[in-house]
Swiss-Prot record:
It catalyses: D-sedoheptulose 7-phosphate + D-glyceraldehyde 3-phosphate = D-erythrose 4-phosphate + beta-D-fructose 6-phosphate. The active site is at K125. This is Transaldolase. Belongs to the transaldolase family. Type 2 subfamily. One of its GO terms (biological process) is pentose-phosphate shunt. Pathway: Carbohydrate degradation; pentose phosphate pathway; D-glyceraldehyde 3-phosphate and beta-D-fructose 6-phosphate from D-ribose 5-phosphate and D-xylulose 5-phosphate (non-oxidative stage): step 2/3. InterPro entries: Aldolase_TIM, TAL/FSA, Transaldolase_2, Transaldolase_AS.
Amino acid sequence: MKNFSLWCDFIENSFLDNEFLNLLSHGINGATSNPAIFKNAILNSPIYKDKILKLKGKKTKDIYEELAISDIQKAADKLAPLFYQKNDGFISIEIDPRLHDNTTLSLGEAKRLYSAISKENVMIKIPATKASYEVMYELMKNGISVNATLIFSLEQSQKCFEALNAGLVEFRKNNIALKEQNTRTPQAVISIFVSRFDRLLNPKAKEQNRIGILNANLAYNNIYSKNEPNIRALFASTGVKGDDLPKDYYIKELLFENSVNTAPLDAIEAFKGKMHFKKPLMNFEIYTELNQIISQSEREKACNDLLSDGLEQFCIAFEDILKAL
């Protein structure tokens, strides 16, 4: 399919040396991480125990960063051939989520992490809050690829695009001799969360497991219509809880061109060999169906609630790691 990319929403040190290589050989083109994923890896995998012991005496955040940066560097190296051959092959790492309402601290942390990792195919993950749009702009302007995350509303996706695109324009303006300098243009993804909508709104909806798909389709249309190939829609939160849906439901339903889907391992396994292009619905079709399922006020409230909840969950996961270290 034209410019569709499937990424793995998981990272763990030993996994990167084994199962991850198998996934890459079967068409996986990138990977993502978040505080919850690192919490699960660091606190539950024995491979980190010796590393943590050797780092004892350092500040807990420094220990976390050494562990996380090491994994991100390893993933970036495994993905490097895809990056240099196909301009894909990215791995994402999120800044400290507790900084989401502080522009200055977020920007400083993002630049510091990018410098410490020192890999071109790393995307710095920035939550889409009011304080963060300036961060996205500055990173793109400085040639640092960005994963704008925790997008639930059309308004968020639009503000993310505006910030990222403005930074991209400035980067290009400042790098007129781009080809001569061999400087790569930064890439960005706008991560639209999908299944969380359905888990929240299914009890109130007249049709089950459709709101997340329709909402994501709407944001995708907005991003795709801008015709900027360096800024793509990414569908996140595409795992299925329970047995009422196929594990790859949210991959198959959002199989759109020039998009990315980052999925958990069970969804990727279920999806193998099912690459069938899906035609996105047009906006008027989306709104017609949405209005039949649930009210606009309920959707808007859900966007705000899900963003607040997502920020809180990532902050808790991050603090849990630090407490355990």
